[in-house]
């Protein structure tokens, strides 16, 4: 009887605690309390030149060079730092050192005869002789369509959660220069650099003794491409009269680092100069300058504008290799290095359409955020959006490292078709970097299309994410963009990832959810620098309400790209308390990338009134968290929080305990009277009342579940 009585007490005590956190009411055969067993995968540490597929016979020469005859642009990649001895040796052999790219241990030699590649491959330290690629520029509705700016169709957007619309975030627009005199780009300039002039001897460089490398030079845009792209990232929408046109970028208050790597002619390599300009070398030099200056304290600006946060690239480099780039060429690797240095890279996927032969360099970078383009049909509504006919499709060429996720490009897509452009000085008269122009009276006109124009819109979203959470790491930013994007199309490789699609990547960028996730992580003090991004835990969009009403049943899917998932948890109180989910029963052991489902339920009536966040995460064996996924729901307000539920449980518990003790005392007294009629139970001195069973504080309780 005593055992039965204790059980009743416990049931009455725990009943209120399970009001918000509960488990699905399916049979035990459908769900298990034990997470499926998983086998981890260990990626071997192998040097990139030993697995790249761009050198199939492992002779340290790009395959396309072996049959090429005549002059060709050549770069050498070393397996270590490039030393003075290396450059002196090359010069003694008659080669001109065009540039040393320290970030990827490379030397650019310019145009040489292709017959020399065999001897160059034998030099000490050289691990790859690479062919220069050719630079190609990829080039109203957009901002609200990606859910950055509010509209009647989508009132809840990224700008709802951004107090300053990107203020204090620096975007390095690496392009043909930006005319920041434009009224929508005025006062955005923080620093600039002209890689074209720095490397080459055009007439103005000869006269000026080359331009400044300290960030003080402000390039002009004699092409239009760079100004248009910066406008889509951060134009304020103002015209020369100070009136708002509505043509804002996604982060109107973000600032500009103006890095000119493109010629006025766009694709080069000539810019109507007397001497040819090699665009490839300028591109590599410009990105190296960004890495070198990622933390620079720019003179004359507030401390909040020091350094470089984002690198926006609306162009690509052809690889000349069959099947495109595998991401191991030096121009893709330098973007990896920029990412690892803390600069978030947003790069265009390319405009080669559905029949593209792989992706070009830059867009093939394993660590960058590669952006494809959608056609928004000139409507804000996203339901009618489709992949743009010109947008390059994935996957990227396999690089041979046994990691299929690297080949999943593009990462995301955004509106890139028929976009209004900010006018550069070239649109209203002659101007270039020899003859200064003025775009102060220019406006917004001329629609353009391309992954060039989708990319800066995403760069602006990234600026908003950094604004609300400055601690975000570049790879965490990429993971947030992937996980919050609107899924488009069926999974192209479901055996490796449940969502990635070869046209859309992980989906159409959702500005609101990306910025809100970034803000929420900051509010609940979840740092992303030590997150395990290999753990994939996602809610599915098929939540339902049970027959009882007010109970949401959540279903999700999970897998791992390497490490083992030890548990999956959910929280309804901002991560203060976590509850384990139920799992799909699985026979045997799951290998890497194999997925399983999970489920849990939440009683919405017992959540605080108003919006509530339901968050879910995975945990590995070291206790490290995955990126969170979430859903927002409206609570019924019948119970404020889980802590309040605990307080109610404590009151009920004390009441039950008091009643139980009284009944038990009467029962003992009666029993004693029957068996020992003259014996009385007398409490010891100083104990006039029965002590409380627990301290008067918030009860730290554990939810009891039925296995």
Residue ranges of model-derived segments:
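Subtilisin-like serine protease catalytic core
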Residues: 158-281, 304-309, 340, 364-367, ...
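C-terminal subdomain of the subtilisin-like protease fold in secreted/lumenal serine endopeptidases
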Residues: 308-310, 414, 467-541, 555
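Long, low-complexity serine/threonine/glycine- and acidic-rich segments characteristic of extracellular
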Residues: 530-645
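Secreted peptidase-domain scaffold signal
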Residues: 55-71, 295, 350, 508-563
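Extracellular S/T/G-rich loop segment that most often corresponds to the catalytic His/Ser-adjacent loop
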Residues: 193-199, 363-463, 467
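Secretory targeting signatures
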Residues: 1-29, 640-707
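Short acidic, glycine-rich surface-loop motifs adjacent to enzyme active sites
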Residues: 287-325, 348
């Amino acid at each position: 009887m005593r055992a039965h009585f204790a059980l009743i007490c416990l049931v009455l005590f725990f009943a209120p605690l399970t009001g918000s956190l509960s488990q699905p009411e399916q049979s035990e055969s459908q769900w298990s309390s034990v997470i499926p067993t998983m086998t981890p995968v260990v990626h071997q540490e192998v040097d990139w030149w030993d697995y790249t597929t761009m050198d199939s016979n492992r002779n340290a020469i790009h395959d396309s060079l072996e049959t090429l005859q005549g002059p060709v642009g050549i770069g050498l990649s070393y397996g270590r730092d490039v030393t003075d001895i290396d450059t002196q040796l090359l010069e003694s052999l008659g080669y001109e050192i065009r540039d040393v790219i320290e970030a990827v241990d490379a030397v650019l030699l310019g145009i040489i005869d292709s017959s020399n590649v065999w001897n160059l491959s034998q030099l000490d330290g050289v691990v790859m002789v690479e062919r220069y690629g050719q630079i190609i520029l990829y080039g109203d509705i957009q901002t609200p369509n990606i859910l950055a700016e509010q509209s009647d169709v989508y009132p809840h957007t990224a700008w709802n959660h951004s107090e300053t619309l990107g203020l204090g975030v620096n975007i390095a627009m690496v392009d043909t220069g930006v005319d920041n005199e434009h009224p929508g780009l005025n006062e955005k300039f923080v620093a600039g650099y002209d890689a074209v002039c720095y490397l080459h001897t055009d007439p103005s460089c000869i006269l000026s003794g080359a331009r400044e490398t300290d960030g003080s030079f402000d390039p002009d845009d004699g092409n239009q491409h760079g100004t248009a792209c910066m406008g889509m990232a951060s134009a304020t929408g103002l015209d020369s009269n100070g009136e708002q046109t509505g043509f804002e970028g996604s982060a109107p208050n973000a600032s500009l680092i103006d890095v000119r790597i493109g010629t006025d002619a766009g694709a080069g390599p000539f810019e109507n100069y007397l001497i040819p300009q090699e665009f490839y070398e300028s591109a590599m030099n410009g990105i190296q300058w960004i890495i070198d200056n990622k933390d620079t304290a720019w003179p004359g600006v507030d401390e909040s504008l020091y350094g470089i946060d984002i690198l926006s690239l609306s162009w690509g480099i052809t690889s000349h290799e069959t099947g495109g780039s595998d991401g191991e060429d030096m121009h893709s690797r330098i973007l990896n290095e920029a990412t690892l240095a803390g600069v978030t890279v947003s790069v265009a996927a390319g405009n080669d359409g559905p029949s593209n032969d792989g992706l070009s360099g830059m867009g093939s970078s394993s660590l960058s955020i590669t952006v494809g383009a959608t056609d928004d049909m000139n409507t804000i509504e996203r339901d009618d959006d489709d992949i743009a006919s010109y947008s390059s499709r994935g996957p990227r060429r396999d690089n041979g490292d046994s990691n299929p996720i690297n080949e999943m490009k593009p990462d995301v897509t955004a509106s890139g078709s028929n976009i209004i452009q900010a006018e550069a000085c070239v649109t209203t008269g002659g101007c270039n970097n020899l003859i200064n122009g003025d775009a102060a009276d220019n406006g917004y006109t001329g629609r353009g299309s391309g992954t060039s124009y989708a990319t800066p819109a995403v760069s602006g979203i990234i600026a908003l994410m950094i604004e609300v959470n400055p601690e975000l790491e570049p790879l965490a930013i990429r993971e947030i963009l992937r996980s919050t994007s609107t899924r488009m199309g069926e999974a192209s490789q479901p055996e490796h990832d449940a969502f990635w699609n070869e046209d859309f990547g992980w989906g159409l960028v959702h500005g609101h959810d990306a910025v809100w996730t970034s803000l929420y992580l900051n509010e609940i003090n979840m740092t992303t620098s030590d997150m395990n991004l290999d753990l994939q835990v996602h809610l599915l969009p098929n939540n339902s309400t049970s027959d009882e009403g007010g109970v949401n049943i959540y279903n999700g899917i999970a897998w791992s790209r390497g490490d083992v998932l030890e548990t999956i948890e959910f929280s309804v109180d901002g991560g203060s308390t976590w509850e384990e989910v139920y799992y799909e029963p699985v026979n045997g052991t799951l290998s890497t990338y194999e997925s399983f489902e999970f489920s849990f339920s939440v009683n919405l009536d017992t959540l605080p009134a108003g919006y509530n966040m339901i968050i879910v995460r995975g945990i590995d064996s070291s206790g490290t968290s995955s990126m969170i996924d979430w859903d927002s729901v409206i609570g019924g307000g019948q119970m404020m929080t889980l802590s309040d539920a605990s307080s109610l449980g404590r009151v009920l518990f004390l009441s039950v305990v008091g009643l139980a003790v009284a009944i038990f005392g009467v029962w003992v007294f009666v029993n004693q009277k029957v068996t020992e009629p003259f014996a009385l139970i007398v409490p010891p001195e100083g104990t006039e009342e029965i002590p409380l069973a627990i301290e008067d504080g918030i009860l730290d309780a554990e939810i009891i579940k039925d296995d």
